[in-house]
Amino acid sequence: MTSEHTMLTGVTDGFFCCLLGTPPNAVRPLESVESSDGYTFVEVKPGRVLRVKHAGPAPIPTPPPPPPEDDPGVKTGLVRCQRRITVYRNGRLVVENLGRAPRADLQGRSGSGDPPAALEVELAEPAGGDTRANPGSGRRRRPRRPKRTIHIDCEQRITSCKGAQADVVLFFIHGVGGSLAIWKEQLDFFVRLGYEVVAPDLAGHGASSAPQVAAAYTFYALAEDMRAIFTRYAKKRNVLIGHSYGVSFCTFLAHEYPDLVHKVIMINGGGPTALEPSLCSIFNMPTCVLHCLSPCLAWSFLKAGFARQGAKEKQLLKEGNAFNVSSFVLRAMMSGQYWPEGDEVYHAELTVPVLLVHGMHDKFVPVEEDQRMAEILLLAFLKLIEEGSHMVMLECPETVNTLLHEFLLWEPEPEAEPKLEPKPKPQLLQPEPAPGEEK
């Protein structure tokens, strides 16, 4: 089929879209069924069905040997999380790290350094303009009273998550326009290592149902879908892996279920800022216009999402369903990205260890945003992949799989409790002899 015929078909379908009011390739809701090819169709709400890839190792007939008893004098994987977050009325945020974060344990090339003792962030412009005193004016700025102060003081036990451990589940969440197919290399890799994996298609993506109402694609609606999937498959130690927009849902679940989320992996997720849809965006155009522009959008995604634009990348874009979604769903997804709660304070409150993976050729997410995320998070490790871009899990699957696996196996170095030295016995003082007496 020629490109001219493809463009003509897109224009024709766009006119039908304007006349009929619905996109011609709308996906109808599916029944909740268990398929024989490893997919499950879960009805999270009446008429709202998500396709889920759920795979894992075969059940072990004999129970594994009991783990060795820990030395009572050694705190294995125990991390003390101490942090004070102060929000001022003028929009200033001060984050003070009061404890020692174990960031140096996973350091290497392109890793993040030790967190600063205090981090100051400007959340928003103060109402009423800039109230700071001019330099050289001789006036001193009055100290502002904090709007609220958040104290974090808890202990986290961070352990190695190995394959075939019955209490470990890996959740993979894709972003806008993708599907669970983008995780194929990661799903196959970790299943071979004995891990249990869960990967859903977001509503309107892949083989999940596509409601024809924009409210079905707001952040809150999609977050509740992910909550339903998480609570259905979660076990004791759960690891969340998100890509792009999917990182926001991982953050949401980690904040909602701190006792169940053991580790988080964010791949090209961006900075720790609240979500707000752009008012001046191409995605605000009518659905029929977006449908006519779909070939151009796909080409733009290939240019921005991949470091190279060769035959291999075009095949990955097609087979991996990296950008394959109806114009209606795309428009609703972009306009529904409203999440004011997910700001810097929200991210600073997380105490779960986080691995940040960034492809250096990413034109959607600048590296400065992931660096900012690493600064805000309490336990964060940033890894940069020089030859990768936004779809780094498709471009560099071996590198990504290695980084993810190393992070799953990582645990902090045990800290032995300081041994108490025995106190010296008190010496009895002899009375001084009286004058003239012999000693």
Swiss-Prot record:
Domain of life: Eukaryota
Keywords: Cytoplasm, Hydrolase, Inflammatory response
Basic residues bias (residue ranges): 138-148
Principal cellular location given in the protein's record: cytoplasm
Pfam family membership, one: Abhydrolase_1
Gene Ontology MF term list: hydrolase activity
Active site: S244 (charge relay system), D362 (charge relay system), H390 (charge relay system)
Known EC number: 3.-.-.-
Keyword Hydrolase attributed: yes
Residue ranges of every copy of the AB hydrolase-1 domain listed in the record: 169-271
Secreted as UniProt keyword: no
GO cellular component term, pick one: cytoplasm
BP GO terms, sorted: negative regulation of NLRP3 inflammasome complex assembly
Job description of the protein: Negatively regulates NLRP3-driven inflammation. Promotes NLRP3 degradation through the chaperone-mediated autophagy (CMA) pathway, hence attenuating inflammasome activation and IL1B secretion. Acts by recruiting palmitoyltransferase ZDHHC12 to NLRP3, facilitating NLRP3 palmitoylation and subsequent degradation.
Homology family: Belongs to the AB hydrolase superfamily.
Quaternary organization: Interacts with NLRP3 (via NACHT and LLR domains); this interaction is enhanced in the presence of NLRP3 inflammasome inducers, such as ATP, nigericin, silica, or alum. Interacts with ZDHHC12.
Name of the protein in its database record: Protein ABHD8
Provenance organism: Mus musculus
